[in-house]
């Protein structure tokens, strides 16, 4: 659980949830604008690498965290980006690297060591967990908004225990 005692922690929690639950890229979060969120239908629109708008479901916990940030912690600003820097001047992040910095600080606050750094680890983790839960590569690619199955295969870190679960048993002494 992310602490939310300070406004910056409220913001960081919402960002971490977007990364972990929706597998958004850091640039998706940096570019997210207030009017990209449809609160009535529970969806948000992201324009990923292709700049093609994709409409994604907004899970309740993620929506709640974003709303907490907007209502209670987001600095007053004319900037229409959802997430702003926590210190003046209050404007959007300049680069996705600032999101990676948030991930690193959150990891440090949580005492998490020995794991890869950066925000992209959440996309890898989401893909792996979906595959372990039985989702197909095509479904995972759709969720991650990949245009190519080869890209999804890179994210789909398959481990030996999972391979053993899906592998066919050795035929043994079957007649030829």
For each of these PLM feature ranges, what is it?
Residues 1-176:
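Conserved catalytic core of the tyrosine transesterase superfamily
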């Amino acid at each position: 659980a992310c602490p939310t005692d300070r406004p910056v922690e409220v913001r960081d929690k919402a960002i971490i949830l977007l990364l972990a639950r929706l597998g958004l890229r850091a640039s998706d979060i940096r570019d997210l604008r207030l009017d990209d969120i449809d609160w009535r239908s529970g969806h948000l629109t992201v324009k990923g690498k292709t700049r093609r708008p994709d409409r994604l479901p907004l899970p309740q916990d993620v929506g709640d965290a974003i709303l907490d940030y907007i209502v209670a912690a987001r600095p007053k600003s004319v900037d229409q980006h959802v997430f702003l820097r926590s210190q003046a001047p209050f404007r959007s992040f300049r680069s996705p690297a600032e999101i990676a910095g948030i991930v690193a600080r959150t990891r440090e606050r949580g005492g998490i060591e020995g794991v890869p750094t950066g925000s992209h680890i959440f996309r890898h983790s989401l893909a792996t967990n979906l595959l372990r839960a039985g989702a197909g590569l095509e479904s995972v690619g759709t969720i991650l908004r990949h245009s190519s199955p080869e890209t999804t295969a890179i994210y789909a870190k398959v481990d030996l225990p999972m391979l053993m679960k899906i592998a066919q048993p050795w035929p043994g002494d079957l007649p030829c």
